[in-house]
Amino acid sequence: MSDGFAPKQENWLSRVARQVPGFRGYFEREDRRAADEAQRRALAERLHRSGAALGGLSQRWLAAGAIDALPLVDALRRRLDVLINRLGNAPRGYSAFFDRQQIDAARLEAVYQYDSELLWDVELLAKKIEEAVSSAAAADAPSLFNELTAAVAVVEERVAGRENVLRDL
């Protein structure tokens, strides 16, 4: 490419490709569906591993007698489960993105950008959940719930934005 975009794109894309299973498949039309599915499943699995730890938080708070905090954990778990299902079970290849021989570079960049941001946001959410599970006291339940719910909302918005970008291709 001689548009002056290639070096920046290559460095950025190389980083994403190393972190997301199957991401390199986006470059080839026939591999796009498989790459998209692999990416979504990897992100869903990351959230699932972190979300599973919320059960330990519930048990710890129950043992401490903080029964009032349990509905907050349950509500967070339900919302996280919906997000995990949305990521992991989305229809495979639901956009013209997966059928086109060539994609406009700007549109492809938008998809890559969403994927990179989604990867970052999922990792941030997973780490916040893991930190909360390892150290949160029941007295912190309301503020913790608000913080984690906000982090879930960021990922939900990122997933919706990515779906819109793919739909508009």
Where are the language model's segments positioned?
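Preference for long, well-ordered alpha-helical segments
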Residues: 135-169
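Leu/Val/Ala/Ile-rich N-terminal alpha-helices, chiefly Sec-type signal peptides and the beginnings
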Residues: 1-62
